[in-house]
Each structure stands twice: as structure tokens, then as C-alpha cells.
Amino acid sequence: MQKIEKSLMTQKTIVENLSQIDSNEKTGVLRPMAVRRRAAARLASVQLGYSAEVTGQSLLEAMPTFLDNYVDDIARQLRVKKMDSEHFYAVVSGVNNRRVELDKMIAEGLSEGWTLMRLARTELVILRAGILELDGMTHIPARAVLSEYASIADAFNADVRFVNALLDGLARRKLRSAEMSAPGQAN
């Protein structure tokens, strides 16, 4: 029970760090509603993953408590009535069904001497969700995925440069190489 309470308290702190996700950092202007709804879904899927990691539950076991306690807070903080539920369930079910494969891709992207066990839980769950989107949701531009998960890493006080570098490297080398090398893409 203490693990669940600790996880829920940590999630409340994270929800308070969301200002960079719902608006443009440079202008302060709110992003479009559809973008914020999808951002809320991404954030919720990462928070659920973190909760499951901390409590030792599966994603599906942790989901009811998480949905009852945090989805409304996330939506309110991102100034949306509700998150993009379809995207949330697609990410959660994808990570749940492909966890071993996603972890293998993360391990392949790590520097020599690094293992999954050495990663912070927050970085691990962010990477799983980001890689899932890069690999399985090709209708979403790779740059958007990279930007969103970098913002989520920042909200979680995770190593943003590490998360971005690993996702970018996998996108360029394996998952979205054609898109990432297309004219107009920054190198």
C-alpha cells in the first residue's frame, strides 16, 4: 500500500510540472486542443507506466486506480476536457503487448556498459512509450514524437538529453530512417 501511495504522491508532483506541455515555450500560446488532448494521453500513459513500475503491478492492474485518481488532474492541467482516450489505450496496450521487444530496442540504443537495470524508471517508461510511437504509429511525425517525449521527460525531471538522444538515434538508424533523412529535416 505504501508503494501505491508513494507513486500517487509522485504523480501529483509531476502533474504540477506540466506548463511546458500545454503551451509553446517561446510564445506562451496554448497549443491546439487536439495536440493537448494527445499530449495528455501520452503523459497519462507514461504516468501509468511509472506507477506500474513503482508498485510492481502490470499496466492493466495499475490502470483502474490510475484512471480513478489522475486522468482528470492531467486533463485539467493541460486545459482539456478529456485526454485522447484512443491514443492513451493504443500506447498502453502497445507497451503492454510489446514490452520485451521495446526493452530490447532500448538496450540496443544504450552505450556500451549500460543496461536497462541502470536506467531510472522514469526514463525507461518514457522510452518505451516513445519507441512504441516511433515504431508503430507512423502517421505521427517523428519530430512530433521526439518533441513530446522530451517535454514529458522534462516534466518528470528525467534526463531530457539522454531520452531525446536515444529516441532520435533509434528513429534515424532503425525506426524512421527515411523520414529523418528527408529534405527539410534537421540533422
List the model feature ranges, each with a label:
Residues M1-N187:
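N-terminal interaction/assembly modules
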